Amino acid sequence: MGGRGLPATLRGLPRPVWLLSAGTFVNRFGSFVLVFLVLYVKHLGYSTAASGLVASAYGVGTIVSALLGGWVADRLGRRGALALSMFSSAAAMLALSQARSLATIFAFSIVAGLTTELYRPASAALLADLVGPEQRVAAFGIWRFAINLGYAAGPIVGGLLAQRSFLLLFLGDAATSLAFGALALVALPKGVRVAAHLETRGEAVRAIARDRGFRLFLIASALGSFVYFQAQTTFALQTVAYGHSSVVYGTLLAVNGLAIVLLELPLISVTQRVPRVPVLATGLLLEGIGFGLIPLSGATVWLTVTVVVWTVGEMVFSPVAGAYVADLSPAHIRGRYSGAWGFSWGIGLVLAPSLGALLYSVGHTLVWLVCLGCGIVAAALVLASPKPSSSRAAAAGAGDQRPLV
């Protein structure tokens, strides 16, 4: 890894990286419907169980979007995939706002999840197209920072809109999607695009199947995702079981968001200089340790410490993971590599609520021991992956050096 400091690296990032991050911030800031979807369904008069079912439907759409989005990013080009995602997301949100029967709400929630998250593989692939290996951790860090900042600030405005009318949530969500889509068409480069006749059938699937290092990374990522999403499920149950209120739980999650805003970019100045694999393993291990420490004490101070530990793991792992996938992926199938990573992360997202709750019901300590074990296994899997050869890294970066239009 290079020795450039973070300020120098950030100054050296090309303009489209900043534009992509700015557009992503606007879109994530306006992701009102995702945050308030359960409350909206209950507002329509449906049960809590029905609300949860609709939220799960949205999640199903996001998982499908990971694989489909990777294919679209490689076929249409990154800019085309981004615009398609944003414009179709706006349409899906408007349609969902008019749905009233549970079946229709369920169906449009799947479509909304699919279209809204279709942009992720294209964004990750475009970042990899735009910068070489030395700048990738910083580029993915800025993009992730924009996502988290948007998610942190958006719900405040969303809550105010919901007080006036839930319809305003859908209109605001659609408007920010349209704004990002327009920005993509006007200001972002096309990125790498592969014509169908230039790629043999099943080439991407075969490439991923042969890539032992990437396969191990996908398994590790799924394990890390399962651990991470306990923060939104069993961690809430454990906090209440310790005698704390929902306000304390919300404050603990706010510590996670605040730490990311304050510390992630400074951390990148360190992680961008270190080989990828040890950094990834450290991040996954810290996530496991952070959740594994939860049963040792129910004191608020101790729970805050555990949040800080797994948050540091998250900040160490995520930007470097994006750069690592970019390093491994051939330029012409980079979108599908990014999509496969998103799919593996989605598996953990789907399993976390149900399996985590099952483990918690068996024994409150068991789920946290499993999280610790998952962190250890995930770190070991990453460390066991073969180091990418210098020739492969050069080939993966070759697509970044030609002009993008």
Language-model segments: residues:
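Helix-loop boundary and gating motifs at the non-cytosolic
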Residues: L10-G59, F214-A254
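Helix-to-loop junctions at the C-terminal end of transmembrane segments
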Residues: S65-G77, L263-R276, Y360
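C-terminal membrane-cytosol helix-exit motif in multi-pass small-molecule transporters
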Residues: T176-V194, L381-P386
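Structural signature of the two symmetry-related core transmembrane helices
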Residues: G80-L94, P278-L293
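Cytoplasmic helix-loop-helix junction between adjacent transmembrane helices
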Residues: F108-L149
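Juxtamembrane intracellular "pre-TM" segments in multi-pass secondary transporters
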Residues: M1-P14, P189-I219, D400-V405
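Residue-level signature of mid-helix packing/kink "hotspots" within the transmembrane helices
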Residues: F32, G59-I63, L67, Y151-A152, ...
